[in-house]
Amino acid sequence: MSNTANDWRTPTLVIIAGCLIAVIGFGARSTFGLYLDPLTGARGWTRETFSLALAIQNLMWGLGLPIAGAIADRFGASKVILAGALLYAVGVYGMSVAETSSMFYLTAGVITGTGVAFTAFSLAMAAMARVVGPERRSMVLGLGTAAGSLGQVIFSPLSQGFISSFGWQQALLLQAAIVLILIPLAMLLPSAKASAKDPNDEQTLGGALSEALSHRGFVLLTMGFFVCGFHVAFITVHFPSYIKDVGLPAHVGAWSLAIIGLFNIAGSFLSGIAGQRFSKKSSLSVIYLARAVVITAMLLLPKTAIFIYLFAAIMGLLWLSTVPLTTGIVAQVFGVRYLATLFGVVFLSHQIGSFLGVWLGGRLYDASGSYDGMWWAGVFFGVVAAIVHWPINEKPLARLQDATV
């Protein structure tokens, strides 16, 4: 970086800070499903009420990320994440004191969702991608995604322990305090746009968006990422309650989320390495098809604790392994200059899927008393996503032919 104010921010420091931001930012929000039963029981709300709030949160995350990405691409991720951390903490605090559904929609949905968008690990990953060469970029993106999964491993049992020891309200207050740690970590990221040479340097934001939206592969990638959001958000929010519904104790649900995160550390990192050696779009097709197969097996086989843990482990390998590959395709085809913005657009589709996965999960459960319809929908969407990714053209644009990812 040519900016002397950023000289002390070495690539290693930026990568470490980015990974820690992913651990806390993603880890904290991945545990909200653990609060479904205690919070709705205390407030007398239905699962649909809770689900709609978290669906709004996912939607705000999706709507906010392109904006956060555009600001980060222009001014750097540091200030964006700092502001987001404050919103995030205020929102989680508000979840603990909201006594009406409308206030819960505001705090858990709008405020927390916006905070999550402005602290998203993809912002940190974009900063990480800019401080390494193209030959290491896919691996670094895998490392950042794996760090987010480590957050899920840490926060799932931690949050369940907070709930068991202090009650759900105090547990949320503790999580709000932990989120504030993002503020000093954000200060370790570059505070202004990196000035490294890039074939995109003369391109405007509007030009980048127009170019991407007219690219068939970008549109297909965006469509496919909808399915990832549908799967991940539904399981994150509703799986702990599903586990209790089939007669297993609550700790099985908490540990299942932790196992998903644990195995996703390996899955995300390995997918990043695979993205350097194999076709990224073909790897994505395999991942989505494998998800459909695993969910089908879970539905048809007996629901014992051991089997649920096995399902969680396999699903964990497939969990966010889509992220380094999806991000990698965007960087490979369009370059890194507007990576945060362009991935934000793709991620909006992911979050629309998340909104539907979370909200429909609660709505269909309240209507039918079962999650089976949502699981089968997940199988169908997994097959569709596998088909959608196959024809993507992942070759760099003509102006980027000298760059490799």
Where are the regions a protein language model picked out?
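Extracytoplasmic gate region of multi-pass secondary transporters
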Residues: F32-L36, R216-F269
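Helix-to-loop junctions at the C-terminal end of transmembrane segments
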Residues: G64-G76, S268-S279, D366
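C-terminal ends and interior cores of transmembrane alpha-helices
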Residues: L86-E99, A290-K303
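Hydrophobic core of transmembrane alpha-helices in multi-pass small-molecule transporters
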Residues: M103-T119, F226, F307-S321
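Cytoplasmic helix-loop-helix junction between adjacent transmembrane helices
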Residues: A108-A146, G335
